[in-house]
Amino acid sequence: MAAPPDLQDEPLSPANPGSQLFGGRGEGEEATPKGARPAQQDGEPAWGSGAGAGVVSSRGLCSGPARSPPVAMETASTGVAAVPDALDHSSSPTLKDGEGACYTSLISDICYPPREDSAYFTGILQKENGHITTSESPEELGTPGPSLPEVPGTEPHGLLSSDSGIEMTPAESTEVNKILADPLDQMKAEACKYIDITRPQEAKGQEEQSPGLEDKDLDFKDKDSEVSTKPEGVHAPNQPSPVEGKLIKDNLFEESTFAPYIDELSDEQHRMSLVTAPVKITLTEIGPPVMTATHETIPEKQDLCLKPSPDTVPTVTVSEPEDDSPGSVTPPSSGTEPSAAESQGKGSVSEDELIAAIKEAKGLSYETTESPRPVGQAADRPKVKARSGLPTIPSSLDQEASSAESGDSEIELVSEDPMASEDALPSGYVSFGHVSGPPPSPASPSIQYSILREEREAELDSELIIESCDASSASEESPKREQDSPPMKPGVLDAIREETSSRATEERAPSHQGPVEPDPILSFTPVTLQSRPEPSSGDGAPVPEPPKSQQQKPEEEAVSSSQSPAATEIPGPLGSDLVPPLPFFNKQKAIDLLYWRDIKQTGIVFGSFLLLLFSLTQFSVVSVVAYLALAALSATISFRIYKSVLQAVQKTDEGHPFKAYLELEITLSQEQIQKYTDCLQLYVNSTLKELRRLFLVQDLVDSLKFAVLMWLLTYVGALFNGLTLLLMAVVSMFTLPVVYVKHQAQVDQYLGLVRTHINTVVAKIQAKIPGAKRHAE
């Protein structure tokens, strides 16, 4: 049965005598559904005439060579109205089993003579304990009607099957007319036939639809709804027709949809008195077939009232609102449906709502909802959507797709006993993910929570900030998300149970016959919530905590800076930080010597250097080395003899006088030698590279400068030799630091004058050298 074109958003209304039923023709809507034949013209033979008159077969329902009768097909989705008083309560199990059942009515203008030899119509009436379930009560028909006789009926299987597993048994409408005939011989009037699409008892489920839904793709598989047709003149045209049906716990308020009439009635047929003879064709499901999830998006939001059964365990999945800012990682929801968090101004689920969901799951509060929620309540609470427990209704998949794309709050109901579907209402797997098929068994019956997407992304941003120590990179994004999502209270955090990543993977496994959601669920523990960094008062970004390695470095720098401030005044050579310390000499000792902090020690060292240098000026290097060696030996031998004589006189045994020095370890290890060699290699290599660059004139200006320096050194060498220059350097090292500390102001003034004079001379020289001026600029 093909879907009719788009339907108007209007309630059911009875037709007037001169118009089609329910206002289809009255408003000028004329259309021919797919698979139906065009309107019958005058003079054409009526459908059903002959031996096979009135036989509703699968060929006749779809398409075939036989002409279709002027039949109006109508499908209505209604809320729960009060069951008529005349309806026997013993027939209510059929209605209870088919909560939200879909009624499709075929209204024909042709009446047929009764045929005694025609086969009975199966599934006309549901017989339950000797009572009859009719589609309409006498009050609904507007005229008192007698009780209908029992009609034998069986559950047909395999005669006619559709794609959704719905079966129909063809039968003759004349038998229906004969059985349901009015005692006043009104069989010549127009008969109203019904096709009742209901579920078997094992397919019970909670069907929840929202008010104001305009279904653009009407199909017999799209909705679980009820249809009731009324005779003309019973109600006002603008009043919604009362519908038959009864729900046990939930009152659903749905919007009716209409199929336009196929045929245009003639004036003669309009003048005929119409009496509806209700006939019900029961279509049963052969089993819930496995149906793959579809990615259809319903533009309208559905507001559903979720009332779980006592044997269900809710799994509430909370997600943060989406961020449409350019800097946000999370893309906005696809489609035209706004998320519930966006409709509330980026709200989030509070503690009261979580507790309310727990109470509803335990069956502590069950309320009958006969109308949509007020605007105030809808604004205070996030809109909760539910999916039907039966996998044969594709409209639930539309709700899933729209909700999964929008990132709304999700409430999942997982049944603890999915096999007990015959004793109680089926506890289907209600979720908003792309999940369908049999409900998965929960890991445990306790309540399980997982915080999705935005909350986890905010945590990842904070962790990245801590690792990179760059608080400014996330100052615009992380605080905004933290303000949008208020922190949960400790009581709620205690109730939240940690959900592992394997659990999130199971819910989206291919065994559920559903595609994986675009955004995976990441587990989130209360410990992570408590460890969230607080935003600073400056730029609003979380204050990063420096790692331990970075905390140790400032301590080492503080130790090195606690030494003398004069250490920074003497710049070390290139790569001085790579120079390993000497065994008996380090940087601190050198500073102490140069600043005369230990006068005795500094005097001895300074005198020794002066003696050595002056000796070299008078004698050769070989003579100086020999004399120094003889002087050292004479001193040590004399001291050794003196100590030996003293011990002999005093009759003491103190041992060797240089025993402490002899036991002192002065050997260099292989590692120390390697360090000194590497340091020396660094200096040698850098010197060789610089000399090669200067002598090979890589830069003409630098080579000319080096040439001028060498020319000046020729005059210095004529006046001083190397030892004299070395002696002057040693004297300057031990005298200039002390003089500069004592007369720093005067020294700085004179140094400024000298620097200015030198710059003037250099400028004059560069002006005379070709190419030097361009290089300076």
UniProtKB/Swiss-Prot annotation:
Sequence ranges of Polar residues compositional bias: 393-406, 525-534
Domain Reticulon: 590-777
Residue ranges, compositional bias (Low complexity): 326-339
Any Pfam family: Reticulon
Transmembrane segments: 604-624, 706-726
UniProt topology in membrane: Multi-pass membrane protein
Domain of life of the organism encoding this protein: Eukaryota
The keyword Membrane belongs to this UniProt entry's keyword annotation: yes
Key word Nucleotide-binding present: no
Phosphoserine: residues carrying this PTM: S13, S68, S210, S241, S325, S348, S350, S485
Name of the molecule in the record: Reticulon-1
Source species of the chain: Rattus norvegicus (Rat)
Gene: Rtn1
